[in-house]
Amino acid sequence: MNTPSSPAHFIRNIIEEDNRTGKWNGRVETRFPPEPNGYLHIGHAKSICLNFGLALEYGGVCHLRFDDTNPEKEAQEYVDAIIESVRWLGFDWKEHLYYASDYFDQLYEFAEYLITQGKAYVDSLSADEIRRLRGTLTEAGTNSPYRDRSAEENLDLFRRMRAGEFPDGVHVLRARIDMASPNINLRDPVIYRIRHIHHQRTGDKWCIYPMYDYTHCISDALERITHSLCTLEFEDHRPLYDWVLDQLAEKIPCHPQQIEFARLNLTYSVMSKRKLIDLVENKLVDGWNDPRMNTLAGLRRRGYTPESIRLFAERIGISKADSWIDMTILEDCLREDLNERALRRIAVLDPVSLIIDNFPDGHEETCYAPNHPQKPELGTRELRLTKQLYIDREDFMEIPNKGFFRLAPGAEVRLRYAFIIKCTHVVKDDQGKILEIHCVYDPDTKSGTAGAETRKVRGNIHWLSATYAKAVEIRLYDRLFIDSHPDTEGKDFKISLNPNSKEVITGYVEPSLCEAQPEQRFQFERHGYFVADLADTGPGKPIFNRTVSLRNTWKK
């Protein structure tokens, strides 16, 4: 896999220093630990590229581990989608696929050990009472009345919790740390709770489940992770990460280092999984893989390439400071990649009939268009010119504005790869809509011949033969939100939805495009980049999605 060049950043500097001092004996093991309660989005791609990229760069491995400790919200559908998305991005975890539930037995044994060491206790307060006694950022918490239960009583209660004797919410297991700590995460955090619910992998074996802060540091240690990379919201959780591993130092093979970096904040997007679920469940989009969604499944269906997303992740870099990344950076990475790989084709999206009156009836001219103007080795394709053509309606103006150099009454333009034509008159319906544009052509001006150089015109428009063009469904996608910051706190993000984010039309394309395969990408000349829809394209019946326009049309 080709990866962009790797500029220095603070995490790479940490790894370099660790390798210099021999801290991990040259090992670099990272992990990407998603919770299977939704589809991955572009923000996850930054973490995926960072974790897998660093492991690849330093000859290490990156684990894919599912944090499946909350069975109420998790499903196999999400596991499968996450696996597919990480693979699609171009990364391979080899044999290192893990689940937090793989460690449930060890996590339970470690919890019993913490109880025997006086480092954990069973609390019988309600969730509301625990929250009330936790205190605030400026006030210390208050000890639970159950904090001083004996180790024997705690062990008995914890085992009975596991045996299923108690309903949900009656007891929890808490770490005994410091209720007066200035870090609220160290005020006796809950590490186990009762949940009588079926787990997708362990079935009904367990009715108590470990909390994330307890689980993920131990999972890291058991997998011998060296550098545990997470986003900045976990910075205040790092003391708890270290506390748990310090208490279990005799039980675990290593103590990984947690390192935080700034998450991705992308304009015109929402990253909250809760809000993405809201969009899907309220049918404001057509599922998790809707091409307007910033999920990796949606971006893939929109026509994004893995290479463009990896380029984006590298280009925005890694830092400790939160900042906003403009959507145009992502789109420019996509344009840069598609400009290299997409074959050129012609499509007429809003057709109007054009008739060349002096073109002989039944006659055809073969014209030649390059498959890629920067790559002559990809050859040319044939376009058939006939008496009746389709052009895009926007390429004609009956009363042209100043600076309009396309077709107008009395004006001349070149038909791309073909001849110069001149508009003579138009035919309209009773409502004044133009039905036909009538022209004459100059047969001595065919592109690629000596005559093409004898006359120059400023306008150059694309066209398709009405005889050979094929009608197809084309979906014109645009940004899902009209507000650059729809996720602003205190604002209903749904009021920023773009009512014009999807338009379905019937357009005309070159006949060869009827054989387009799902995910095959093209540049529709003068329009933008399009892809044959991954989900809905059938044999001989492609549906094309607009991936991105040729240039940014959004005002900053």
Curated annotation (Swiss-Prot):
A molecular function GO annotation: ATP binding
Reactions catalysed, as given in the entry: tRNA(Gln) + L-glutamine + ATP = L-glutaminyl-tRNA(Gln) + AMP + diphosphate
InterPro entries: Gln-tRNA-synth, Gln/Glu-tRNA_Ligase, Gln_tRNA_ligase_bac, Glu/Gln-tRNA-synth, Glu/Gln-tRNA-synth_Ib_cat-dom, Glu/Gln-tRNA-synth_Ib_codon-bd, Rbsml_bL25/Gln-tRNA_synth_N, Ribosomal_bL25/Gln-tRNA_synth
Gene Ontology annotations for the cellular component aspect, listed alphabetically: cytosol
Keywords (A to Z) from UniProt: Aminoacyl-tRNA synthetase, ATP-binding, Cytoplasm, Ligase, Nucleotide-binding, Protein biosynthesis
SUPFAM superfamilies: Nucleotidylyl transferase, Ribosomal protein L25-like
Motif ('HIGH' region): 34-44
Cellular localisation: Cytoplasm
Motif ('KMSKS' region): 270-274
Main location: cytoplasm
Residues where L-glutamine binds: D67, Y212
E.C. code: 6.1.1.18
Binding site for ATP: 35-37, 41-47, 231, 263-264, 271-273
Stretches assigned to coiled coil: none
Transmembrane segments: none
Recorded superkingdom: Bacteria
CDD domains the record matches: GlnRS_core (cd00807)
Oligomer status and interactors: Monomer.
Similarity remark: Belongs to the class-I aminoacyl-tRNA synthetase family.
Record-linked HAMAP family: Gln_tRNA_synth
Protein name: Glutamine--tRNA ligase
The species this protein was found in: Nitrosomonas europaea (strain ATCC 19718 / CIP 103999 / KCTC 2705 / NBRC 14298)
